[in-house]
């Protein structure tokens, strides 16, 4: 029997230990990864409930990262995934509203642009201060569902925490209050630094039979690349030609939706393209830092490229998209936007690899190097709960 959304939260309670009561909402692998250090830091200083919407329900997209990143299991699983997108979004809002109404947190914290972030709609209706990390990111591509979510969550949030000055300017252009917008930087450097010894110690190459520097790492899962027929065929024809051209394994960290799409289409991948279940945090990053090239549509690619360059492990980073919400990483030359057609993708891989061989690496993005982002977030949340209650909601 399929899980049903959880609407009864009578069993969920804060510890009531006198600390600020904060609910952190997650739902996908990227949120769990980026928030790892923030969640652990908040648990030290606040009374925290971690709520998981269930948007990513596969263990390899979810549970393995709690283990790798030394995170306690969420106090709440909403099981909000519905039969279609409308049902899922509706369940996320409904479940979150009921959770917030029952537990009465002092604040709600979300990160990014996933459907799980729509939980803040319930918090807004209940006059609960909302804190949004990764605010102000824009790629200006209306085909991306995340772009809609970004606008909604930025506008609803009471305090927006941006990664960069680019993002802060976007927020200002939207008319959002400058006095409640801060640049914290990306939380990824802190997470990667905290896990660097485990990343370097991973035996993933031995387990998978791969030789360092002689494989291409592939990650392709975005809706616009997988669900759109034209883009899907263009991308995977290019991947097959890449395998033929470089004559080396292409390890494809393949999400369930991508695997299902490939199976349903009957598309024949080159034998050198190896489909693998999504990899854990330590294994994936060990593979990145030792790859001939990394070809990915992941939003964290620019941040990971910047970090590994800063610690002496640069890799050729190629983004299989036509836009980016991280222009600050383009400013510093940390990755190449390749598009998804065969010619431009192969040219981009060639260029990135040759530049790396010549020692022409990008420069670490200043907004991506701070390793105290979790501390900044704790101080901002503690500072602004009272201010929002007084200045926005007139509670006292």
Report each predicted region and the residues it spans.
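Nucleotide-activated sugar donor-binding and catalytic core shared by glycosyltransferases
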Residues: 1-248, 258-396
């Amino acid at each position: 029997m399929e899980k049903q959304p959880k609407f009864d939260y009578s069993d969920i309670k804060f510890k009531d230990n006198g600390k600020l009561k904060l609910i952190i909402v997650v739902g996908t692998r990227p949120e769990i990864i980026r928030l790892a250090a923030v969640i652990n830091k908040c648990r030290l200083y606040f009374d925290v409930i971690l709520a998981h919407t269930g948007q990513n329900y596969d263990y390899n997209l979810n549970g393995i990262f709690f283990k790798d990143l030394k995170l306690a299991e969420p106090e709440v699983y909403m099981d909000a995934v519905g039969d279609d997108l409308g049902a899922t979004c509706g369940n996320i809002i409904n479940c979150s509203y009921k959770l917030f109404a029952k537990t009465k947190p002092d604040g709600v914290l979300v990160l990014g642009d996933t459907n799980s972030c729509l939980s803040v709609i319930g918090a807004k209706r209940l006059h609960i201060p909302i804190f949004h990390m990764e605010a102000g990111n824009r790629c200006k591509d209306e085909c991306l569902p995340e772009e809609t979510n970004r606008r909604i969550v930025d506008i609803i949030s009471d305090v927006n925490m941006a990664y960069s000055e680019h993002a802060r300017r976007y927020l200002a252009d939207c008319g959002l209050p400058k006095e409640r917008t801060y640049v914290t930087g990306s939380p990824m450097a802190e997470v990667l630094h905290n896990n660097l010894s485990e990343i370097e110690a991973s035996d993933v190459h031995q387990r998978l039979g791969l030789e360092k520097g002689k494989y291409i790492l592939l990650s392709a899962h975005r809706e616009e690349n997988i669900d759109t027929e034209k883009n899907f065929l263009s991308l995977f024809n290019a991947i097959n030609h890449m395998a033929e051209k470089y004559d080396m394994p292409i390890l494809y960290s393949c999400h369930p939706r991508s695997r299902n799409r490939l199976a349903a289409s009957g598309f024949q991948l080159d034998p050198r393209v190896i489909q693998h279940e999504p990899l854990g945090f330590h294994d994936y990053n060990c593979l990145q830092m030792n790859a001939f090239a990394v070809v990915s549509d992941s939003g964290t690619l620019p941040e990971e490229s910047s970090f590994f360059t800063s610690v002496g492990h640069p890799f050729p980073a190629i983004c299989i998209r036509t836009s980016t919400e991280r222009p600050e990483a383009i400013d510093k030359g940390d990755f190449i936007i390749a598009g998804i057609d065969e010619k431009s993708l192969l040219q981009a891989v060639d260029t990135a690899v040759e530049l790396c061989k010549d020692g022409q690496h990008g420069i670490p993005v200043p907004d991506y190097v701070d390793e105290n982002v979790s501390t900044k977030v704790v101080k901002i949340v503690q500072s602004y709960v009272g201010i929002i209650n007084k200045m926005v909601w007139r509670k006292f």
